[in-house]
Amino acid sequence: MRVRALMTAALAGMAMLATQTTATAQQAGDPLSEKQWGLAQLRAPEAWSTSTGAGQIIAVVDTGVDLGHPELASKLVPGATFAACGDRPAPCGNGDWRGVDGVGQASDVHGTHVAGIAAAAANNGVGIAGVAPDARIMPVKALENGSGSFEEIGAGIRWATDHGANVINLSLGAQPGTQLLTLLGQGAETKDAIAYAREKGVVVVASAGNETAPLCDTPSWEAGALCVAATDSAELHSVYSNLTLKPDMKAVAAPGGSSLNGCDGDVWSAVPRGTGSAKCGQGDYDSLAGTSMAAPQVAGVAALLGAQGRNADSIEQALMKSARTPILGARGVFTPLYGYGVVDAAAAVAQPM
């Protein structure tokens, strides 16, 4: 069984799933940041005076990353490739999006986009700003041509855990119904790897899924993973997003875009150089939608919290207790649409340690 990256098919054409002063300064340093409505929804700029994620490593277990992208090149720590490495997953590359054959697949722009959302460089004169602009990125390529096996993904999670990751982002998921198979012991490699990461004190953030299903997909369904649903620019539950139901109820929501309201209604981030789409792209940048785009927003806020010296349990509690439920205005109250609410970076970093 294969697990897929999770950006919306409608947008991508493939089955993959501050204060005013601060904002103005950010736009001057990052020209596309004026399109990043997600940062405002997260209240990330208001959190940066407290934490920018310095010293934290976010592992992006995904399709690999463009290692030379100007938003990411200066921020990378050594990564690894587990996709298409032979019969048994073992590192056979450095996490580059082009894979072992050196050929970048169209669907494999996904990992660079996810990495940029989480931790793109800020105030560098180009593009965007990441949620945790001073965090580092560990590129782990476990998906090739948009999909990978439970074994490859599990190996990537374990490798990232053993090589210093503080946060692991999983913007990927299996088809609805796979939850039952994992409960019966199939596909246990990813489930067991998530448990291993949590035992080692790593925060694991995963996409809820894009099937409008009632449950979090595997692997966000698994105990130890924080399931992330998507919101649109109006802070409403995105039409494609799964609900946040799972046994341990560890779930939140974050900006993922609508897939219906044009390029600027979705999430702008980096893509491998020169691969921006004709519809929305600007060469090295593009706008995509999906719970894949929501998860790294939360991974970035987790890095902001980790840089404050919090452990994994404290990070998860700060994320959930400070999250806000749209319309109701409540904080830290579980609903199926939003989990414990839309993540609020400024409120999270202000939570007691």
Question: What positions do the PLM features span?
Answer:
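Structural detector of well-ordered beta-strand residues that form the stable sheet scaffold
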Residues: 77, 138, 203-205, 226-227, ...
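Secretory targeting and sorting signals
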Residues: 1-25
